Regions:
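C-terminal and inter-domain tail/linker signature
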Residues: 1-137
Length: 137
């Protein structure tokens, strides 16, 4: 089961995160999926929320690419350590495009049930990204 769960997350990264195939979200997440973002209480709910999140990310960084650096699975959880690169070409969190390149590291912890993501806890170097964009010292 752990290997199947890892394959599910590899597919999500290949098709949605990198490929922009937002229609695949319905095949990858449950109808009540929750993404628990790093700010307490900040959450994304349901497949439509997930689609909107990745659509906005791809609009801001059209060339974004995630690379899996490491992946572990135990029981119903998969931990994926990743690096992403992209160019800020569209509005991102209220910030106008800067044309700057980013390189950001992060980890996602995903809980899988019946072959779909039920919950996700993404953690990334947000400060490092903002510094690269010139929005933080």
């Amino acid at each position: 089961m752990s290997e199947q769960n890892k394959m599910l997350m590899r597919r999500a990264i290949k098709e949605v995160w990198n490929g922009g195939n937002f229609a695949a979200v319905d095949e990858l997440v449950t109808s009540d999926v929750v993404l628990h973002l790093s700010k307490p209480g900040d959450e994304i709910h349901g497949p439509e929320g997930v689609r909107q999140f990745y659509t906005a990310l791809h609009a801001a960084f059209p060339d974004i690419h995630f690379t899996i650096e490491d992946q572990l699975a135990d029981g119903d959880k998969v931990v994926t350590r990743w690096t992403c690169h992209g160019t800020h070409q569209g509005e991102f969190q209220g910030m106008s495009p800067t044309g700057k390149q980013i390189s950001v590291t992060g980890i996602d912890i995903d809980r899988i049930a019946d072959g779909k993501v039920v919950e996700c806890w993404p953690i990334m170097d947000e400060l490092g990204m903002l510094q690269q964009l010139g929005a933080a010292p």
